[in-house]
Amino acid sequence: MLGCKEEDRIQFRIIKYSLTTLIRKWCDKMPIVFVSENAKKEADKIKVNLFQMQWKDQNKFDSGRKVFHLEHKYTVNDMINDMQKDPQSIGTIFKNYQIGWILKCEDSKLQKTNRINHDATYLEADINLIFRQ
């Protein structure tokens, strides 16, 4: 993929777009790993267990997707960048992948890409996470 980036930017963009789509579709089947404390408080008010909800379920409890955001803690863009840097680490990259629910207002505080330390990003944004037991 690195060679492709250097040789043909258009081809690289097509590959990156395809990988992004594949990873996001894969995520649709993955269990929710974390929920922010604030998202849990909001979900408790409407009697929803966010650990049981996937992106496809969101409109059932959040009409218009206005309150909650399904967050990729290890962003898809960062995953692809890491795959590009070290193609041998793809297995490790997928093992480190985490998704969870936060509030839209919390999402606005997060750096969208190039998160060097994903845990530190949440601490800096003052977003406390509850992990699946």
Features from the language model and the residues they span:
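Histidine-centered nuclease catalytic patch
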Residues: 60-93
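Amphipathic alpha-helical interaction segments
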Residues: 34, 80-82, 130
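Catalytic cores of phosphodiester-bond-cleaving enzymes
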Residues: 93-96, 100-133
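Domain-level detector for secreted/extracellular nuclease and nuclease-toxin modules, and
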Residues: 2-17, 77-80, 92-93, 110-115
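Hydrophobic transmembrane signal anchors and adjacent membrane-proximal interface regions, especially
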Residues: 48, 53, 70, 90-92, ...
